[in-house]
A protein has these predicted regions:
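Glycine-rich phosphate/adenosyl-contacting loop at the front of the ribokinase-like
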Residues: 1-77, 119
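Conserved N-terminal subdomain of the carbohydrate kinase-like
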Residues: 52-136
């Protein structure tokens, strides 16, 4: 009998805001917003493969947080360790695209002077799991 998920994915769930080819995602339109963040992507991928997986992270009480909450539930990701933050927004990463399609991460958008929700992750006891994946932003 399993005591917890096989894998816990700890870290970021964010929006990748891709600007138009050759443009700046901070000012040029249209932009293409995609749900992203390596731990969130891995959690969804493992769940689709039938692996018991939990996501541990913190999102804002905003449209981005709501979209991830729905996605995790739809994909079968355990959200018991998902925290929501009423004061800080979810993170948006600005991604510049060259005309040839190459991507360059340019910075963040959405901070209102309080930082981002993922910076305020409250310590929690992780359930027993066989594997732990940690994203790069918490480091």
């Amino acid at each position: 009998m399993a005591l917890g998920p096989v894998v816990v994915c700890l870290g970021e769930a964010l929006i990748d805001r891709l600007g138009p080819p050759g443009g700046d995602p901070a000012v040029d339109r249209p932009v293409d917003d995609r749900l992203g963040g390596a731990p969130a992507n891995v959690a969804c991928g493992l769940a689709r493969l039938g692996t018991s997986v939990a996501f541990a992270g913190r999102l804002g009480q905003d449209a981005i947080g709501a979209a991830f909450s729905r996605l995790f539930v739809e994909r079968g990701v355990d959200t018991a360790l998902l925290q929501r933050d009423a004061e800080r927004p979810s993170r948006i990463v600005l991604v510049r695209r060259a005309r040839d399609g190459e991507r360059q991460f340019q910075g963040f958008d959405g901070d209102q002077g309080t930082g981002f929700a993922d910076q305020a992750l409250e310590p929690a006891a992780l359930p027993p799991a066989r594997w732990l994946l940690i994203g790069t932003l918490p480091l």
